[in-house]
Amino acid sequence: MDADEFRRLGHALVDWIAEYRERLESLPVMSTVRPGEIRARFPAEPPRQGGKLAEAVASLDELVLPGITHWNHPSFFAYFPSNTSYASVLGDLASSGLGAQGMSWQTSPAATEVEEVVMEWLRRMVGLPETFTGVIHDSASTATLTALLCARERASGHGQNRAGLQGGEPALTVYASDQAHSSVEKGALLAGFGKAHLRLLGTDAEHALRLDLLEAAVEEDRARGLRPCALVATTGTTGTAALDPVEGMAALAERHGMWLHVDAALAGTAMVLPECRWMWRGVERADSLV
């Protein structure tokens, strides 16, 4: 593909996206195809010659769109809000067009420093103190895993880093409510804590973590010779948008020398409004936040 064809197909694809968005409301929210139906529309063998990108763009309506669940549909209310705007589509285009890898300052200084600017803007927008900074992760799940890894290393004095899971030290434990997002359990497993050392505790009538159950679980684990390591407080659970008592959990974490991670992936954006910040009162005492 040369630059002229790129321009032509790019304009065609932008037009297709705009037209799709304009008629989105008239489409069914969920796809009505059966399992395997989309796959059956494609040939079994790969094409012997490439370069038929114009045909690929033209086939989006016929081959792809029937199998799409329309996450940007005004009647889509499942999972997390994930709507993309025209501006974000253009941002993806610019990022792909530059093709820069931003894993370090040297590989792309602008990527590193723009990320710092964006995180500083976000910090100010949600009213976090100057002690906070951040990085952009590919997902909230990855961010929670990173937080649990940091908690593990702090609690073990980097012993897990050196000796791994076979170091022979007493097991570390993690605590969250039974309403916490599945990424907490997955993160605990990937970080090596194991299901046996993850405590998913009961909630009150508002579906928020009960501090009395948390305190009892921590004390019981200490008595058994285990090492309480991390708490995960949720600001906006996936099921009911419940709010865990961040301030009370922060006090408990400080008392027991534990890492406090706040999962605000669902309701965190509401903190742009000062009148909503009571929802995560005490967040400034957290060790990490997503």
Regions found by a protein language model. Name each.
Residues 1-131:
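N-terminal entrance/gating region of PLP-dependent enzymes' catalytic architecture
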Residues 1, 5, 106, 135-138, ...:
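A structural signal for alpha-helical segments
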Residues 84, 101-108, 112, 124-141, ...:
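Peripheral, non-catalytic segments flanking oxidoreductase cores
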